[in-house]
From Swiss-Prot:
Entry keyword Transmembrane helix: yes
Family note: Belongs to the nematode receptor-like protein sre family.
GO annotation terms (biological process): sensory perception of chemical stimulus
Listed name of the protein: Serpentine receptor class epsilon-32
GO cellular component term of the entry, any: membrane
Spans traversing the lipid bilayer: 34-54, 66-86, 124-144, 168-188, 195-215, 256-276, 286-306
UniProt KW keywords: Membrane, Transmembrane, Transmembrane helix
InterPro entries: 7TM_GPCR_serpentine_rcpt_Sre
Pfam families cross-referenced by the UniProt entry: Sre
Native species: Caenorhabditis elegans
Location(s), subcellular: Membrane
Membrane topology: Multi-pass membrane protein
Main location: membrane
Length: 361
């Protein structure tokens, strides 16, 4: 959605928001919003359970958690931004004009822009758009930050596990958040072109791929040395654990990369199809919600990849317990028979020993 602000001097200012509004009957908008809220609540449950399991069963280094957790937590802000959009869509926020249909991610067509003379009443919508941009770029830069942390851990293998200093994850978190916020503001206020807005994830993916190869080669080499009985280098227990941790993180990261690539490919195709009117505007609902519902494939992939996480996730997940209880055969009758049999044997045993005791008196 592009907002064009015309001041009295006829100078135009543009705002670029990643929000969508549809030209649909109001009843259908209510229905679609209810369906979206149901999926968001389910996704909220899944995300919360995943965070709980990751914090309860900590199988990675503390520094990795300091980088990972904020990336997951900003999803809650993303949903808050979406709820603001729904409030405007259902006209819970009163405006003096109609917002109209806005399904183009970016456009130069003046007819597809929202023309206003003031931002009065649009403050919440702008904030919601910023939150959504911030989430996207937090993930983009956050992945690069995680890759950098694992690369540093591979280089500083001598004492990284035993080092209690937090300056590395804190510095990486500050840098990634600074980049995410500054990039989000630049895109929001249209200080960056369409190409520049895509440049961060292109650079991050390229650097992340190089970091992935570096971490993989270095740690596989360490693993060969550890398993070699004739090795000349001595690896401490903490260093061996760190190598296994890096390889475990790579296995998890590889699966997540395929999931993210599928997501990016689907959304990119959807945006391309919408831009050239290859599909109807209703398809935009699916493209938009693919961003908000990304915890479904990501959390399931993460939770089911790590065996320790899988067990606790299945026990904590409400949906899993419902399915498990539905497919589990009731054992009430068998249990009652076993209990009655046990009590009968106990009574007979007590009677036997009482009779035996009395016979010796």
């Amino acid at each position: 959605m592009i907002i064009k602000i015309l001041d009295p001097s006829k100078n135009a200012t543009y705002l670029w928001l990643p929000v969508y509004f549809y030209d649909e009957p109001f009843q259908f908008q209510i229905l679609s919003s209810i369906i979206e809220l149901v999926f968001y609540i389910s996704c909220f449950h899944l995300m919360t359970i995943s965070l709980y399991v990751m914090l309860k069963v900590q199988i990675f280094h503390r520094n990795l958690y300091i980088l990972y957790i904020p990336m997951f937590c900003v999803w809650y802000g993303l949903i808050a931004g979406k709820l603001i959009t729904i409030a405007y869509r259902l006209k819970f926020v009163d405006l003096d004009y109609e917002l109209g249909e806005h399904i183009a991610m970016w456009t130069d067509d003046q007819a597809k822009m929202l023309h206003v003379s003031s931002l009065r009443g649009l403050e919440l919508l702008i904030f919601g758009g910023f939150v959504q941009w911030h989430y996207m770029y937090t993930v983009v830069y956050g992945i690069l930050g995680v890759a950098a942390e694992r690369a540093i851990a591979s280089v500083l293998i001598e004492n990284y596990e035993t080092n209690t200093q937090l300056y590395i994850p804190i510095a990486l978190t500050i840098i990634t958040q600074f980049l995410a916020i500054s990039t989000s503001l630049s895109v929001l206020f249209h200080k960056a072109s369409v190409f520049l807005s895509h440049l961060p994830w292109i650079i991050s993916c390229s650097l992340g791929a190089l970091a992935y190869l570096f971490i993989k080669i270095v740690n596989e080499n360490f693993q060969k040395q550890i398993t070699n009985p004739r090795r000349k280098r001595l690896f401490t227990i903490s260093q061996q654990f760190q190598v296994k941790e890096n390889l475990r993180a790579l296995r998890l990261g590889t699966r997540l990369v395929f999931v993210v690539f599928f997501y990016v490919a689907f959304v990119s195709f959807g945006m391309f199809a919408l831009a050239f009117d290859l599909v109807s505007s209703a398809y935009c609902h699916f493209v938009e919600n693919f961003l908000f519902l990304n915890p479904y494939p990501i959390c399931f992939t993460a939770m089911l990849t790590i065996p320790h996480w899988r067990k606790h996730f299945q026990n904590a997940c409400f949906t899993w317990r419902l399915v498990k209880s539905a497919w589990t055969k009731p054992k009430t009758s068998t249990t009652s028979v076993e209990i009655s049999t046990t009590k009968k044997l106990e009574a007979e045993t007590d009677l036997y020993f009482r009779q035996l005791n009395e016979s010796w008196i």
